[in-house]
């Protein structure tokens, strides 16, 4: 069945602006979200989701109470939630393979909601802006189209993307919202930023920059964050890129150079350094080709635990 808004079938294709004009409650929800102040989210109880990652859990989780992601410029952050059992998935999509990613998001939630007798699937899309290359617009269209193709009814509750998430300053465009968090217990979605993006922030960023596909990073049954094992081919011309100045890196390695947060270039440089240091990560970063496992300790912070079978 299709994508629905307030019980009505969504007519596609149409732009985000056309969609909210046809459904005023969507426009109001986007306005309220844009109007919020940004909350700084601390590490306790947080599961931070990087680009090309997804995480899913439920209110029964004793370790995780918040899912979040930020630094989205042309990217979109997607939250899919089952209202019956509260199972919630958050993912950071960059448009690399939306056709494969949406079914992955759906199956991650449905693995929780098989036994839910009531409730419905609700989706929230946030991110992007009116960028010159129209990458945000393309991703908005892809996500709406792919959710509309799924077998289940999916209710579009929040749409704050592309033109609806755009501000203009000195004739340049920027996103209004760069990051959001969702409270697993209350289902509240709010504007957020994060200082702690771990664990293994550089490794996870390197995997995405090297072209890795969307992956699920959390096992809610064991309440463990699981990374890898993953591999990548040596990053092409890594020494060349590390020799470039900040302006060149920003203009060449960003989808939206003017709209990036201040730490973007520093983040790219450190990720490139990591890729140079570990051109083939398999046995060095993943001893015995086993995953790296982390669990929240009693203070709500990530702690490394031994790999399975070690």
Curated annotation (Swiss-Prot):
Disulfide bonds: none
Residues passing through the membrane, by range: none
GO cellular component: cytoplasm; nucleus
Annotated Pfam families: N_Asn_amidohyd (PF14736)
Major subcellular site: cytoplasm
The entry's keywords: Cytoplasm, Hydrolase
Record InterPro entries: NTAN1
GO molecular function: protein-N-terminal asparagine amidohydrolase activity
Entry annotated with the keyword Nucleus: no
GO biological process: adult locomotory behavior; memory; ubiquitin-dependent protein catabolic process
EC number in record: 3.5.1.121
Enzyme class: hydrolase
Top-level taxon of origin: Eukaryota
Compartment list: Cytoplasm
Catalysis: reaction(s): N-terminal L-asparaginyl-[protein] + H2O + H(+) = N-terminal L-aspartyl-[protein] + NH4(+)
Subunit description: Monomer.
Function as written in the Swiss-Prot or TrEMBL entry: N-terminal asparagine deamidase that mediates deamidation of N-terminal asparagine residues to aspartate. Required for the ubiquitin-dependent turnover of intracellular proteins that initiate with Met-Asn. These proteins are acetylated on the retained initiator methionine and can subsequently be modified by the removal of N-acetyl methionine by acylaminoacid hydrolase (AAH). Conversion of the resulting N-terminal asparagine to aspartate by NTAN1/PNAD renders the protein susceptible to arginylation, polyubiquitination and degradation as specified by the N-end rule.
Stated name of the protein: Protein N-terminal asparagine amidohydrolase
Organism per entry: Mus musculus (Mouse)
Source lineage: Eukaryota, Metazoa, Chordata, Craniata, Vertebrata
